């Protein structure tokens, strides 16, 4: 699993636990522009963290960590909000598009996100999201929105999910 925008580490913990026992192997690779320490609780040596901007990562880095590709790309990336819903949703959409582009990375037979894999992106509701969801449908068998029950009623946060990459 690749966790884009992994700071402060909650999804790293959830993802590591989802791998099951250490004997089953697996990898959770997190990246964030903020310095992030591996959470000590609920994680183990299968969690690796890179400090940097995911948009600037060279494909050889993805291949060196995930030589066989990944089953899930998760984006919890979020910009500093301005309080202007139009600007905030546009920036959020830009980050979701970045996650989508990273999930499509291919080179010489290598695919970062394996066929059948999933893409999960946090996004702020606003203009352009439905068009983006339609675009995702050309790459994923199923595309859906999810708003967790625990989300505050005033929050514009939703998850856009692509399942079963074609």
Each language-model region and where it sits:
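Class I S-adenosyl-L-methionine
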Residues: 123-166
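Glycine-rich S-adenosyl-L-methionine
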Residues: 87-108
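S-adenosyl-L-methionine
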Residues: 31-81
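Conserved class I S-adenosyl-L-methionine
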Residues: 1-7
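Short beta-strand element of Class I
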Residues: 23-29
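Conserved beta-strand signature within the Rossmann-like core of class I S-adenosyl-L-methionine
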Residues: 111-123
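Conserved SAM-binding loop of SAM-dependent methyltransferases across substrates and taxa
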Residues: 8-23
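A generic alpha-to-beta junction signature in SAM-dependent methyltransferases
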Residues: 19-23, 66, 106-113
């Amino acid at each position: 699993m690749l966790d884009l925008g992994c700071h402060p580490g909650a999804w790293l913990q959830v993802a590591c636990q989802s791998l099951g026992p250490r004997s089953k192997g697996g990898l959770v690779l997190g990246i964030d522009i903020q310095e992030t320490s591996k959470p000590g609780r609920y994680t183990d040596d299968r969690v690796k963290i890179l400090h940097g901007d995911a948009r600037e990562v060279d494909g050889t880095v993805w291949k060196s960590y995930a030589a066989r590709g990944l089953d899930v790309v998760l984006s919890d990336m979020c910009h500093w909000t301005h309080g202007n819903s139009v600007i905030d949703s546009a920036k959020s959409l830009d980050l979701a598009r970045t996650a989508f582009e990273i999930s499509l990375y291919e080179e010489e037979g290598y695919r970062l996100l394996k066929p059948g894999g999933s893409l999960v992106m946090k996004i702020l509701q606003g203009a352009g999201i439905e068009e983006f969801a339609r675009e995702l449908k050309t790459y994923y068998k199923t595309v859906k929105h999810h708003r967790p029950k625990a989300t505050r009623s005033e929050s514009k946060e939703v998850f856009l999910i692509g399942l079963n990459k074609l």
